[in-house]
Design a protein with these regions (language model features):
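Glycine- and Gly-Pro-enriched alpha-helical subdomains that act as flexible
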Residues: 179-205, 211
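Conserved alpha/beta cores of soluble small-molecule-handling proteins
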Residues: 1-172, 176-179, 206-207, 219-311
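Feature captures the catalytic cores and cofactor-binding loops of soluble hydro-lyases/lyases
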Residues: 212-217
């Protein structure tokens, strides 16, 4: 399997990164995960442009250009003979001394593109939905990297491990005000009284959520289907009381959420100390809702249409 690193295709086992790379030394880096179908990448330019915007805003580099990176990613699909794939584009600060950097770096970044067969998720994920939990930490819209896809994934990995330990498929981040920001690796949508609602991204008021490419596609499709859409804060009670809920990212597309673990007072014997336990609470009727199903079908058709035969 070949990878693309700093302008060259090499075998994955021969790819090299400097021991002084800022991504390795300081965790300074950004990435994009993209979905390829029919040998083409879905909305590749939007992914790369989002990454370039983050690189500028976080003062990593101003010298990223979308077209060469999109071409390199598409060429890699051909070299690795992949019709369907998970594409990962990673950039780091390169050989950067963080203590001497006072503005946007003039150091060339390290750029790595990899491709792999996509993860195959169980059919039950999409036919029955998954359960989620609330992450223990908080996601603030006021931190400099809020809403950017950075390499700083430690807290998210810990939250996902805790979710897996409770047999949940995703952990939801709350803001300091106890509104839902997003999932660890996904954007959240709820459906309430026929309206599609999603927490604001960093482009919309100050939001902590990533402006997801799949999120944007779902919003476009919903509006084309005359489904009302609101981008607003989502308190926990609104999520728990929603008619439907689902998550979006490049790998899942649209993934239904049908339950959430919530804290409840456990029944105890008279005179015993009260205790708290976690119990599943159904979202809506506990099954995949009609709006969720319609939007998933519409998105899959959109992906197939945009990546299909252009000739």
């Amino acid at each position: 399997m070949d990878v693309w690193i700093n302008g060259k295709f090499v075998e994955a086992e021969r790819a090299e990164v400097s021991a002084f790379d800022a991504g390795l030394q300081h965790g300074v880096g950004l990435f994009e995960t993209m979905h390829a179908c029919n040998g083409r990448i879905f909305r590749a330019h939007q992914h790369v442009e989002r990454l370039a915007e983050s690189a500028r805003m976080l003062r990593m580099t101003e010298r990223l250009h979308a077209e060469p990176l999109v071409e390199a990613a598409e060429l890699m699909l051909e070299r690795n003979k992949l019709e369907r794939a998970r594409i990962r584009l990673t950039i780091t600060g390169g050989n950067l001394n963080m203590l001497q950097s006072t503005g946007t770096s003039q150091q060339d970044p390290t750029i790595l593109i990899t491709s792999q067969p996509p993860t195959e998720y169980p059919d039950d994920f999409f036919e029955k939905g998954i359960g989620v939990v609330f992450a223990a930490g908080r996601l603030s819209p006021w931190t400099p990297d809020a809403g950017h896809k950075t390499l700083n994934y430690w807290s998210r990995i810990l939250a996902l491990q805790e979710a897996a330990a409770q047999r949940a498929g995703e952990a939801l981040w709350l803001t300091p005000e106890a509104n839902i920001a997003s999932g660890c690796v996904s954007n959240l949508f709820i459906v309430s009284d026929g309206t599609l609602i999603t927490p604001p991204s960093r482009h919309e008021e100050p939001g902590a959520a990533l402006p997801g490419i799949t999120r944007a596609a779902v919003i476009e499709l919903a509006e084309s289907m005359n489904i009302p859409v609101e981008r607003r804060r989502v308190p926990v009670d609104d999520f728990i009381g929603a008619d439907e809920a689902f998550l979006t990212n490049s790998s899942w597309q649209v993934l239904p959420v049908t339950s959430v673990l919530v804290r409840t007072n456990a029944e105890t014997e008279e005179g015993a100390e009260p205790s708290i336990e976690m119990r599943p609470h159904s979202i809506g009727e506990g099954g995949v809702g009609g709006t969720t199903s319609d939007l998933r079908s519409a998105l899959l058709a959109c992906i197939d249409r945009e990546t299909g035969d252009q000739g």
